[in-house]
Swiss-Prot record:
Entry superkingdom: Eukaryota
Function text: Possesses antifungal activity against B.cinerea, M.arachidicola, F.oxysporum, R.solani and C.comatus.
TM helices/strands, residue ranges: none
Disulphide connectivity of cysteines: none
Taxonomic lineage: Eukaryota, Metazoa, Ecdysozoa, Arthropoda, Hexapoda
Protein name: Cicadin
Chain residue ranges for the region called Disordered: 1-39
GO-annotated biological processes: defense response to bacterium; defense response to fungus; killing of cells of another organism; positive regulation of cell population proliferation
Compositionally biased spans, kind Basic and acidic residues: 1-26
Gene3D superfamilies registered for this protein in UniProt: Antifungal protein domain
Keyword list, A-Z: Antibiotic, Antimicrobial, Fungicide
Length: 55
């Protein structure tokens, strides 16, 4: 079934990224911490504080 193939592909990609993140963390923990903070900032970024209150 094509749908399941798509989901499996996405799940595998996520696993790979997580593992890559762990590997990076072991090798260079300081870079990891900085990159993580930047990513969180980008994901939770709102143009306007009010945007966070809109449901």
């Amino acid at each position: 079934n094509e749908y399941h193939g798509f989901v499996d592909k996405a799940n595998n990609e996520n696993k790979r990224k997580k593992q890559q993140g762990r590997d990076d963390f072991v090798v260079k923990p300081n870079n990891f911490a900085n990159r993580r903070r930047k990513d969180d900032y980008n994901e939770n970024y709102y143009d306007d504080v009010d945007a966070a209150d809109v449901v």
